[in-house]
Regions:
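Generic beta-strand/beta-sheet core signal
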Residues: 2, 63, 87-90, 106-107, ...
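Conserved C-terminal RecA-like helicase domain
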Residues: 2-86, 114-125, 199-202
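Alpha-helical scaffold elements adjacent to nucleotide-binding pockets in ATP/GTP-utilizing enzyme cores
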Residues: 11-16, 74-77, 100, 126-130, ...
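C-terminal accessory/connector segments of nucleic-acid motor ATPases
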Residues: 68-79, 162-217
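Beta-edge loop/turn motif
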Residues: 72-108, 115, 132
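Conserved segment of the helicase C-terminal RecA-like domain
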Residues: 99, 103-161
């Protein structure tokens, strides 16, 4: 269940907990109680952690960058094992993590865009990425994706389902991002020469897209 913010993912998990909890068998409740205790035993008892542990007892969890690595790994592992039945997450879980989700629900197609200072519909590319979490080949024969939207369903299908993803554009063309990565490269590669820095970034996606040296001294 994908949400647009950390707070929203936590809220959706809480709303789903009572419904999911009613469908659990006694043996499942025992397993979830152990997972809940592990979360509490391994982490500082902040309000966030205590809330997570409470929801896990009902077969539900949330997942976002506000949780530490230990909690995220426990949640991912137990969802993968089928112990946690429903996972509410921010879009960060859409990339790089392979989880056995039969069904993906996109709870809101709008995201806040700081550049424009307003909410904007997600891109077709992000939609495809989110939906791609459902029905992973090694876990399921098929997957389902559901959009919760306010507009006409046919329009959503035409735009998102039948639409072509936008071209991928490197973020390194942004001065701030490039500066951060240059400093990171220099700090982790003692003795690196100027032409090596230029060569390194010229081989990135940004370098290939602008077809000229990414960095100029």
């Amino acid at each position: 269940l994908f949400a647009e913010t950390r707070a929203r993912s936590t809220s959706l998990a809480a709303k789903a907990a009572d419904v999911v909890g009613k469908s659990l068998a006694e043996e499942e409740k025992k397993d979830l109680d152990k997972i809940s205790k592990k979360i509490l035993n391994d982490n500082e008892h902040t309000d966030l952690i205590k809330n997570l542990a409470t929801l896990v007892k009902k077969g539900v969890a949330f997942h976002h960058a506000g949780l530490n690595q230990n909690c995220r790994e426990i949640i991912e592992s137990e969802f993968r094992n089928g112990k946690i039945k429903l996972l509410a997450s921010t879009p960060t879980l859409a990339a790089g993590v392979n989880l056995p989700a039969r069904r993906v629900v996109i709870s809101n197609i709008n995201r806040y865009d700081a550049k424009f200072g307003a909410n904007k519909p997600i891109s077709i590319l992000e939609y495809k990425q989110l939906c791609g979490r459902a029905g992973r080949p090694q876990y399921d024969k098929f997957g389902e994706a559901i959009i919760v939207g306010n507009s006409n369903g046919t329009e959503l299908i035409d735009y998102y389902v039948n639409g072509t993803p936008e071209p991928i554009v490197s973020k390194l063309t942004d001065d701030r991002a490039l500066r951060t990565h240059v400093l990171s490269l220099v700090s982790t590669t003692p003795g690196i020469k100027k032409d090596e820095i230029v060569g390194f970034f010229s081989e990135t996606l940004a370098g290939s897209q602008i077809r000229e040296p990414t960095i100029k001294f």
